[in-house]
A protein has these predicted regions:
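Secreted/periplasmic proteins
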Residues: 2-130
Length: 130
């Protein structure tokens, strides 16, 4: 393989590795506490605890129901907890609607929020992908 083909191949793999980061949307996350049923999407059907409620930004007239998102904490939204992030990401399923006035793009279950951030922060900056 000549140098130009090798360089092109290396650049392609590098860009492919960056693609998921480039497609991530930014927003904020808050959390809500149990009970998690009934929910707008599934009524009284229990969908576990790695769940979330969608704000108007992603609700899409119930089309968000069942969508899975990978959510990653990026940082604080206030001075209360300066470094809230755990360094982990969490995969959640949309099961509910966070009505107008919702304080976050995604309202995570308490368990999902605690997996990626200190709950004392209350609200965090996030990146999320489907």
């Amino acid at each position: 393989m000549d140098v130009s083909k090798a360089s092109l191949l290396a650049a392609t793999f590098l860009l492919a590795g960056l693609l998921p980061v480039a497609l991530a949307a930014s927003g904020t996350a808050t959390f809500y506490t149990p009970p998690y049923v009934p929910s707008a999407c599934y009524g009284f059907q229990n969908r576990g605890v790695m769940i979330a409620a969608a704000s108007d930004a992603i609700w899409d007239n119930r089309a968000a129901c069942g969508r899975r998102y990978r959510v990653t904490c990026r940082g604080p939204t206030n001075q209360g907890v300066l470094q809230p992030c755990t360094g982990r990401s969490v995969d959640v399923t949309i099961v509910d609607y966070c009505p107008a006035g919702c304080q976050g793009t995604i309202d995570l279950s308490q368990e999902a929020f605690a997996a990626i951030a200190n709950p004392d922060a209350g609200k965090i900056l996030i990146d999320y992908t489907r």
